[in-house]
From Swiss-Prot:
Transmembrane segments: 41-61, 95-115
Keyword Transmembrane in record: yes
Gene Ontology CC annotations of this record: plasma membrane
Name of the molecule in the record: Uncharacterized protein RP436
Membrane-protein topology: Multi-pass membrane protein
Main location: membrane
Cell location: Cell membrane
Keywords: Cell membrane, Membrane, Transmembrane, Transmembrane helix
Length: 141
């Protein structure tokens, strides 16, 4: 397998593992770490880009769920959503930073879309969180 195929496989694996419907872990990432012939910086950049792509899909899915939720026009649920949104906005930055955890991060991105987090804020904090996570995986562990 040449390096382009390996990096493409890393992108697809990280993308799929960050989707809300997937419960797998990023297996190719760990395999590439064990085989030391790969550039760590490129691995870091590819993993960050692919995970942000997956989280963006989850964010958009959260927006779709929100539109369906408001289309139901159930006043009691809408009032509950507004109260939860106020609570979410109090801890928004911390909650978005939890995107760095592999399993729970996909749910955080879904909830960010559902609670109408600003997209650029979501992407910037999510990028920083994933960069910290992957850098610690590559350079420390």
């Amino acid at each position: 397998m040449n390096q382009f195929e390996a990096y493409s496989l890393l992108f697809v694996d990280s993308f799929v593992s960050n989707l809300i419907i997937s419960f797998q872990n990023e297996l190719i990432f760990h395999s590439m770490q064990m085989l030391v012939g790969y550039n760590r910086l490129i691995m870091l950049l590819v993993a960050i880009c692919s995970s942000l792509s997956g989280n963006t899909v989850n964010y958009l899915f959260g927006k779709i769920v929100l539109n369906i939720f408001y289309a139901s026009k159930n006043e009691q649920n809408i009032l509950r959503h507004k109260n939860l949104t106020k609570l979410y906005y109090q801890y928004e930055t911390f909650i978005i930073f939890l995107i760095s955890f592999p399993f729970w991060g996909c749910f955080v991105s879904l909830f960010s879309g559902f609670f109408k987090t600003k997209f650029l804020k979501f992407l910037s904090i999510g990028c920083l969180a994933k960069a910290c996570y992957y850098a610690s995986k590559i350079y420390i562990f």
